[in-house]
A protein has these predicted regions:
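Glycine- and acidic
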Residues: 78-85, 117, 124-128, 176-187, ...
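Beta-rich nucleic-acid/ligand-interaction surfaces
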Residues: 217-226, 276-286
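Post-HExxH zinc-binding segment in Zn-dependent metallohydrolases
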Residues: 131-141, 279-315
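N-terminal helix-rich structural modules
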Residues: 1-87, 91
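Active-site-proximal, well-structured secondary-structure segments within enzyme catalytic domains
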Residues: 55-60, 94-242, 312-314, 319-320
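Active-site recognition of the HExxH zinc-binding catalytic motif
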Residues: 246-269, 286-290
């Protein structure tokens, strides 16, 4: 019974074990279907490359077009290329959703989303309340700053704000913003070695990362997974990251973010039991990673790490803050979508 075990380490291990096993107590045939479907989707998604006029292009190449290209037709082609992967995996994702919901209902949950939160020790009603409140608090600020962004984009392309199309934005999903204001933030990273900047920064705050970087996969190549993640290999300090580095703000932020995850995992107490030798909770490692990634938007960090001068520092302060503010407001809309979907 709950509360009968007084050894806190043992009690916590039992809770962790229960939550890890709980979602898998389903029919083995259904489990096999889910695993096979997940693998099929991952294979299709990871190997997919969108095409522009029949030529395969990487996500980084699409991003460059959406950041720099003035020709609306070329921008539209790049934006549409970024969406082609959806057509390739959508039917399989729908099948997986149905399988997962079937599994969750076998275990007495409303759907897979609710089950995933419950076994991650989060209450769906509390999470929904938090995000509904967040949306209410940010609706007006988002609306105001989005109007400013649209006015800036309309001016750049010589169109009216109401004529703006999705491909006029730099991010194909409008999950973040890099084009807000008159200052080109990417130019401060152009030609810089993002790997070495990251190494210098982390070593400088007494979180050495040479071992992490040595074993990591950091640069783009044909057929490689195009995004980024961190993986704790053995819970004994062998932590690795995957990136597709390019010399811009986005990949500097991402690199710092992933190493944030990695240094968290690397420095967990080694004398803890194996089951507890991982992040205390997902949101803690994520908070650490966000904190570290955000340094790329910090003028003091930029002055120290990429060498901006005092005059640039003064002009950049507001631009970086506004850029970060709008990016967070934009992404907050994405954070709210899964909750609406789960309760639709």
């Amino acid at each position: 019974a709950k509360g009968t075990i007084k050894d806190t380490l043992l009690a916590r291990q039992l809770i962790v074990l229960f939550n890890q096993f709980a979602r898998n107590q389903i029919d083995t045939s259904l489990m096999r279907q889910m695993v096979e479907k997940q693998a099929e989707i991952a294979n299709k998604f990871n190997n997919f490359r969108g095409k522009i006029n029949g030529k395969e292009v990487s996500d980084n190449e699409i991003s460059e077009v959406l950041k720099n290209e003035q020709n609306p037709k070329k921008r539209q082609e790049a934006w549409e290329a970024s969406k082609q992967v959806g057509q390739a995996v959508a039917p399989f994702v729908v099948e997986l959703v149905k399988l997962r919901n079937q599994a969750a209902k076998q275990l007495g949950y409303e759907n897979y989303y609710v089950m995933a939160l419950a076994t991650d020790e989060q209450d769906i009603n509390e999470v929904v309340r938090i995000f509904d409140n967040l949306k209410q608090l940010t609706d007006e600020p988002f609306k105001h700053i989005k109007q400013e962004l649209d006015a800036s984009i309309a001016k750049r392309f010589g169109i009216k704000p109401q004529d703006i199309q999705p491909w006029h934005y730099a991010n194909p999903f409008f999950q973040e913003v890099s084009e807000y204001g008159e200052i080109d933030l990417d130019k401060y990273f152009k030609g810089k070695n993002i790997e070495e900047i990251s190494r210098t920064f982390y070593n400088g705050i007494n979180l050495p990362v040479d071992d992490i970087l040595k074993n990591s996969d950091l640069y783009p190549r044909k057929g490689k997974y195009q995004h980024a993640f961190c993986n704790d290999i053995d819970r004994l300090g062998d932590v690795r990251i995957m990136c597709n580095l390019s010399d811009n703000l986005y990949w500097t932020n991402t690199m710092l973010h992933e190493i944030g995850h990695a240094t968290y995992s690397k420095n967990i107490q080694r004398d803890l039991p194996f089951l507890l030798r991982t992040e205390a909770h997902t949101f803690l490692t994520e908070a650490t990673a966000i904190l570290m990634g955000r340094q790329a938007n910090n003028v003091d960090w930029l002055q120290a790490m990429v060498g901006i001068n005092k005059k640039e520092k003064q002009s950049l302060g507001k631009a970086l803050f506004d850029n970060l503010r709008l990016s967070e407001l934009a992404f907050s809309r994405w954070r709210h979508i899964p909750l609406q979907t789960a309760y639709a």
